Amino acid sequence: MGYCAEKVYMDKQGVIRWTENKKEVALFGANYCLPSACDFRAAGYVGGERKQMIVEDLEHFKRMNWDGLRLCFWGDYQNTDREGNLQENEHLHLLDYLIAEADKRDIYMLLSPIVTYNSQWPEMSDTTNTGLAKYYPKNTLIHDEEAIRAQENYMKQLLNHRNPYTGRSLKDEPNILFVELINEPTQFPEDIPGMVR
């Protein structure tokens, strides 16, 4: 399927615009994280079939005229190993399904694949997380060379991962407009150059 033309761009003033008509991008939606962490577990508590719940949620969102979602995906906890190798599991399969279903409904997405907050919140009862976050705490993600390599590895594998529902790599999904590398990274005001290298 190959490269996907960019639907948006940033102008010289830092405003994100649609490539097609040059209008400012203005989307409305919310965070959505049923494929992982607390929402994944909550669906299990009520005996829900997660794929059907995704469809029902997206139908509600469309009825409310939502056109944007921030996909919070705890890959740093639930879908990687220490080196950042992508792990195939139900969380990833549900993310693929969610992306395909959102795409069908013309819902645009911001993908946030490194969340940094423990995926076991609020219960904190499961200690089986295998992800890179188990080895690299939030405050090491920007400066620690091993942590940076693990994140680079994870991001490359995730963005090149082929979605079986769409047949496209995540990097080529037309409705994923943005990728937020690290959710709420630790700030180091005494080392601004080190934060933006």
Residue ranges and their predicted role:
Residues 2-4:
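Boundary at the C-terminal end of the N-terminal hydrophobic targeting segment
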Residues 7-197:
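Active-site mouth of glycoside hydrolases
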